[in-house]
Amino acid sequence: MIFDMDGTLLDDLSLISHVAGSVLQAAFGTPEAEARIHYLATTGMPFEAQLAQLYPHAPADERRRVARTFHERKVTEAYAHAGPFPEIPKLLKRLSQGGWTLAISTGAEAEMAEIVLEREGLRFWFEDLLGSRDGTKREHLQEYRRRYPSAPLILVGDSRFDMEAGQSMPGVTTIGRASTVHGWTLTPADLRRWGAAWADYSLARLPEVLDQLFPSDRTPTAEARTSGNGPASAARGPPRREGPGPRASRRRG
């Protein structure tokens, strides 16, 4: 099971969107409120890809410079103040105890995602993490599919891009977190229209939903996994964790 981070695990979308609006105004002259909406409308992809879509005529070097500024300010102005949605710690524990293998696919830089998740006590639950330098959401899914060729994948995200990325690959089930921030709303109906098998404003009911989507008699076996290191798939196994502990004790593969 593959989780997006910003806006899905972390309640940080509003903070990040204000950073983006300020950065885009300073770099390209777009009014901040308008730039913020443009960012929200294209969220779900790496920021560099958003810039290429929003400002295709800007030189690539300039877009890279703006992206660096955004990532730096996101750390100090968003991640420094953001935390997980209230249900997330308990949810991750329930999923792990239920045998689900968990991983991260984020448009943020992997190194910063690692730090934030560690700070919030969440990194322990995830087997692997792919970030912006590892490609787009679709490319992350392709890599997960390569490592888990026979197992269905579940992508949990909060954007149209997340839903469409999941729909672009056979065998991927998409789950959506609906959101409401100032000036921007994505309803459960929006996310279902873009392909979500289930969507809500909270993920607290996700374990029960998964039991309906993946009954025990359809649970993939261990043979569905490939050997070696591995990110998350929808494959289940016996419960493996009782709670956070030393990182060295985490079993991979």
Predicted regions and their residues:
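Non-catalytic pre-domain segments flanking phosphatase-related domains
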Residues: 1-3, 215-253
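N-terminal helical cap/lid subdomain that shapes the substrate entry/recognition surface
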Residues: 1-86
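Conserved phosphate-coupling serine/threonine residues in phosphotransfer and NTP-handling enzymes
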Residues: 8, 106-108
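A short, structured active-site edge motif that brings together acidic residues
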Residues: 38-39, 122-137
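Short, acidic loop-to-helix structural element flanking the phosphoryl-transfer center
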Residues: 76-104, 114, 139
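Short acidic-hydrophobic, aromatic-tinged amphipathic segments that line or gate anion-handling sites
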Residues: 130-131, 197-205
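Conserved Lys-Pro-Asp/Glu-containing loop-to-beta segment of HAD-superfamily phosphomonoesterases
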Residues: 138-166
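Acidic, Mg2+-coordinating phosphoryl-transfer loop and its flanking beta/alpha structural elements
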Residues: 156-200
